[in-house]
Amino acid sequence: MNYPIMVNLNCKEITIIGGGKIAYRKAKNFIDFGYKVKVISLDFDERFKDIENKTELIRDEYKEEYIENSFIVVAATNNRDVNKSIGMYCAEKNKLANVVDDPTLSSYIVPATIKRGDLIIGVSTSGKSPSLASKIKKDLERVYDDSYEEYIQLLGELRCKILKKYDDPVRKKQL
């Protein structure tokens, strides 16, 4: 069973093993949230050129040394045995791992996500139906459009002012 959680990955090493379409999508997702990513592969999908200034691209085959200091690892190669090896290593070393072709070896999954500034909405079917999660995400994108980015910013500013101005916890909650 999965537990929903938001994780701060600032100053954490993020490593993706693999250079194909899935690896690119995973790297782009981390970058869209403001993180730098290390990607290891012998070959890279051409789209990696679009994000090479925000990634450390290493042209090499997978070696354990590449993930020794990683906090979070994505195994996205086209080789199930390599992915399995990465997943097992991460489990042994208590690292967060997403093995793209074997959810049983993954310690986390990434929900379908909508980001509107500081408003982040994640939708997951716990891997049962990614297409349904994607459909729900599209429905929510229509409801929570780009205007929510500014709205959330305003609410955050108001909340700070209320917290500073009032000492009474009941009053703070009412406001």
Task: Please identify what each model-predicted range represents.
Residues 72-77, 83-109:
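ADP-ribose/adenylate-binding Rossmann-like module
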Residues 99-148:
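E1/E1-like adenylate-forming module used to activate ubiquitin-like modifiers
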